[in-house]
């Protein structure tokens, strides 16, 4: 296991955001966390990178684990000129060759001299991915990495994520609202709503009562289930897990 939680509970002020979260991620997995707004998805990722302290429970990391993180939003002063290369060098200096390699892995080679504020939404998301790839992390954390993209852009981004996993051998944890693509492009789904409602392989989770209570189902969901590839499924995730 690369990273995991054991009975993790997080409070912000008097409000409990996450309660009794227990989960783990194995090398090479793509795990997608889904849930309604305010369900604690971003908070869980922030806990994994050490930005939020749990009230109780434990966060477990493999020794020497390296992380790459792409946040949900990017705040840059529009009046401040900044090239992609400069952005990717902060807060520590990345070499030109490392930056070039990361941009290529993210599917946007040759953007080093472009101004950050001139990028399209799709290009910016790829640059955030490239920045997270610097240092070749063993675990990649992506928070709503496809927000603002059109359906084709979302599909292209998911293909790139799979390519990154295959090339680097890293595990990937994604927060996403793209339910249809999640069911095709991930190994395991964790359905979160302040606690883990259910988790498992996408086709199993999508039929669970807990998932249906949150999201319902339509023909597009059924088509997505049919298109899901089982090639990278693991036997110990072959059944549905529910919160006790």
From Swiss-Prot:
Subcellular localization is given as: Cell inner membrane
Q: Which SMART domains match?
A: AAA
Membrane topology term reads: Peripheral membrane protein
Q: Where does ATP bind?
A: 35-42
Query: What are the residue boundaries of the ABC transporter domain, all occurrences included?
Result: 3-218
- Annotated Pfam families: ABC_tran (PF00005)
- Which top-level enzyme class is recorded in the Swiss-Prot or TrEMBL entry? translocase
| Annotated InterPro entries | AAA+_ATPase, ABC_transporter-like_ATP-bd, ABC_transporter-like_CS, Metal_Ion_Import_ABC, P-loop_NTPase
**Per UniProt, which keywords does this protein have?**
ATP-binding, Cell inner membrane, Cell membrane, Ion transport, Membrane, Nucleotide-binding, Translocase, Transport, Zinc, Zinc transport
A GO BP term, please?
A: response to zinc ion
Keyword Zinc-finger included in the entry's annotation: no
Molecular functions (GO terms): ABC-type zinc transporter activity; ATP binding; ATP hydrolysis activity
Q: What is its EC number?
A: 7.2.2.20
- Family designation: Belongs to the ABC transporter superfamily. Zinc importer (TC 3.A.1.15.5) family.
- Functional summary from the UniProt entry: Part of the ABC transporter complex ZnuABC involved in zinc import. Responsible for energy coupling to the transport system.
Q: What is this protein called?
A: Zinc import ATP-binding protein ZnuC 2
Q: Which organism is it from?
A: Hahella chejuensis (strain KCTC 2396)
């Amino acid at each position: 296991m690369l990273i995991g939680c054991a009975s993790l509970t997080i409070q912000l002020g008097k409000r409990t955001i996450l309660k009794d979260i227990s989960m783990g991620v194995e090398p090479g997995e793509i795990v997608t966390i889904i849930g309604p707004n305010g369900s604690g998805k971003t908070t869980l990722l922030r806990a994994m990178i050490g930005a939020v302290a749990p009230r109780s429970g434990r966060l477990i990391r493999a020794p020497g684990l390296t992380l790459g993180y792409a946040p949900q939003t990017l705040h840059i002063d529009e009046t401040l000129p900044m090239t992609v290369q400069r952005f990717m060098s902060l807060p520590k200096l990345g070499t030109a060759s490392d930056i070039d390699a990361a941009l290529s892995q993210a599917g946007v080679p040759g953007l080093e001299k472009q101004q950050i504020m001139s990028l399209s939404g799709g290009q910016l998301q790829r640059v955030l991915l490239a920045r997270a790839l610097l240092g070749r992390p063993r675990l990649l954390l992506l928070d709503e990495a496809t927000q603002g993209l059109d359906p084709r852009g979302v599909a292209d981004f998911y293909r790139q994520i799979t390519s990154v996993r295959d090339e680097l051998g890293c595990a990937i944890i994604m927060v996403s609202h793209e339910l249809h693509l999640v069911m095709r492009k991930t190994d395991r789904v964790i359905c979160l709503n302040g606690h883990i409602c259910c988790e498992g392989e996408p086709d199993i989770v999508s039929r669970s009562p807990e998932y249906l209570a949150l999201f319902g189902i339509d023909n597009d969901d059924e088509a997505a289930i049919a298109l899901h590839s089982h090639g990278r499924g693991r036997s110990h995730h072959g059944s549905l897990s529910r919160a006790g």
